[in-house]
Amino acid sequence: MVGQEQLESSPLCQHSDNETETKRECSVVIPDDWQLTSQQQAFIELFAEDDQPKQ
């Protein structure tokens, strides 16, 4: 059986009041001991990308 570690949650994206002047920086932190396939990495990166605002 694999034990699950309790991970501290922290925001991935920092929201700024002046989005027009400052680009939001998003980053995904993956623990070093995680062995991800390229397909899993691509899936995570898909959600890390900024969405275009709908008009």
Swiss-Prot record:
Biased composition regions of type Polar residues, renumbered to the chain: 1-15
Biased composition (Basic and acidic residues): 16-26
Region (Disordered): 1-26
The organism's place on the tree of life at top rank: Bacteria
Name used for this protein in its record: Uncharacterized protein YciX
Organism per entry: Escherichia coli (strain K12)
